[in-house]
Amino acid sequence: MRILLDNISIIPVSGSNSFIEKGYLLIEDVFIKELGTGKAPEGEFDHIIDGENQVLLPGFINAHTHAAMTLLRGYADDLPLMEWLENKIWPLEAKLTPEDIYWGTMLAIVEMIKSGTTTFNDMYFCMDEVARAVELSGMRAVLARGMVGVGPESEQAIEDSRELIGKWQGQAGGRISFRLGPHAPYTCPPAYLERVMQLSDELQAGIHIHVAETRVEYEDILKQYGKTPVSHLESLGLFQGRQVLAAHCVHLNEEEIGILHQYQVGVAHNPESNMKLASGIAPVPRMLESGIAVALGTDGASSNNNLDMLQEMRSSSFLHKVNTMDPMVLPAYQALEMATANGAISLGMGNELGRLEPGYRADMIIMNLKEAHMTPRYDLLANIVYSAQASDVNSVIIDGKIVMENREIKTFDEQEVLAKARETARKLVGK
């Protein structure tokens, strides 16, 4: 398959804030073959896209989410995290069937595709169903079966993870990858994390874990183990020689920032979820300054309440400007890097995703520049980060395949997904 995108603005996110005003990009099979300015190459193409009044950029990478929690969107709001989890979310999650998880994930995929996300990093359960949804839809995903180290499910989570990695690692042409998902240091005792580390080494699988999301967690870990969460995990050896993505990292001291940098731990910043749950403000400018690959995530739709990475970019930039009282903090290009290149680096995929460069996987989005809120256009990067809306995402290409064109999803029936999701939600709450 050869696809030519011509007469289009291009933001490659290649380490500088430069962009191509009018150019072309050629896709061959699943890879970017070439891109540049001026006249496009001649030849035979399976598909040609005229990019007049549009911009091409890497697909967004949602570095931390719980996709099927779209089914819980709006079910419980305006509550503290632990009350929200223990009294509302966990009891309803206990009712979810594998089929529910499938349709909840498909609903999330509709929302993500239509807002420009091409890869998501997911932690949940019934992950066979999540993988099945990813395979069908054409999305790319890094998946982890959530593992809680206390209670009757702890052993099953180990066995499920082993089986899932054996079954799904590298499937769907490499669009599906799996890692281990120990939930958090407060739900996974040291002995359990030791087993997770052993399995990680045995299967050569990365780790996705929540870390230091709330002040209560931070203080409880300090009281229980005499160390802060990041220091506690370092003392156990969790970061040593493993590809680790730590979600949230809201409450950190300078020593912990140094530890994360030392071990090249990726961090998923979830600004809107952290704001909504009043968890705190992560020290993102300091982490970026230290060289940590800070990516962006939405968390689950039940605590956000959407999966829109354009909103996360805008929110992250604005949040840290006001928190530092410095309008120059986290400028537009840096926010875009967090949503693309840093997302790839944080997941150990920095050499194949997150940029538009020859040899990289052909994961990209085309955005419309014609609407009133995108006019005038003095600064293209600023318009994308500060003005764009999900509805501006016109087309999506993942692994060299057109997944959405002119706002129409090509790989599955969007209306069927919406109908099934509504039916599932009614069943869950008995309405």
Swiss-Prot record:
EC number(s) stated in the UniProt entry for this protein: 3.5.4.28, 3.5.4.31
Keywords: Hydrolase, Metal-binding, Zinc
Gene Ontology terms, MF aspect: 5'-methylthioadenosine deaminase activity; metal ion binding; S-adenosylhomocysteine deaminase activity
Job description of the protein: Catalyzes the deamination of 5-methylthioadenosine and S-adenosyl-L-homocysteine into 5-methylthioinosine and S-inosyl-L-homocysteine, respectively. Is also able to deaminate adenosine.
Family listed: Belongs to the metallo-dependent hydrolases superfamily. MTA/SAH deaminase family.
Family matches, as Gene3D superfamilies: Metal-dependent hydrolases, Urease, subunit C, domain 1
Residues where Zn(2+) binds: 64, 66, 210, 299
Official protein name in the record: 5-methylthioadenosine/S-adenosylhomocysteine deaminase
